[in-house]
């Protein structure tokens, strides 16, 4: 399904860009305050989670449905978990996400950004 392909690429790129570039800059919190809003975090987490589940069920151009889009699915799932953590922190609620995942937010952001670029360039490749 092509719409889920583009949704996966867009959400992985947005999550990767936010986690790697914007979180390292302190002035981005003042320039783009909506990026740190609870509603934005929840919407991006839900879209990323939906795209990850749909990519696992419906791969693009692969013969093995479970293994077809493994890397974008993993990137979308971890991005969903990280932004659910941001949502819980913004609402001052305890987060169900493990600290080890949150500690590696920047490398996971790089993984998500790389997954979106590679998935955009090499869509029919198996395991990507």
UniProtKB/Swiss-Prot annotation:
Q: How does it sit in the membrane?
A: Multi-pass membrane protein
Q: Which UniProt keyword terms apply here?
A: Cell membrane, Membrane, Transmembrane, Transmembrane helix
Q: Where are the transmembrane segments?
A: 2-22, 34-54, 64-84, 108-128
Please tell me the species this chain comes from: Treponema pallidum (strain Nichols)
Q: Does the keyword Cell membrane apply?
A: yes
Cellular component, GO annotation: plasma membrane
Protein's name in the database: Uncharacterized protein TP_0070
Keyword Protease set for record: no
Report the locations given in the UniProt record. Answer: Cell membrane
Subcellular location, principal: membrane
According to the entry, what is the taxonomic lineage of the organism?
Bacteria, Pseudomonadati, Spirochaetota, Spirochaetia, Spirochaetales
Q: Which residues form a coiled coil?
A: none
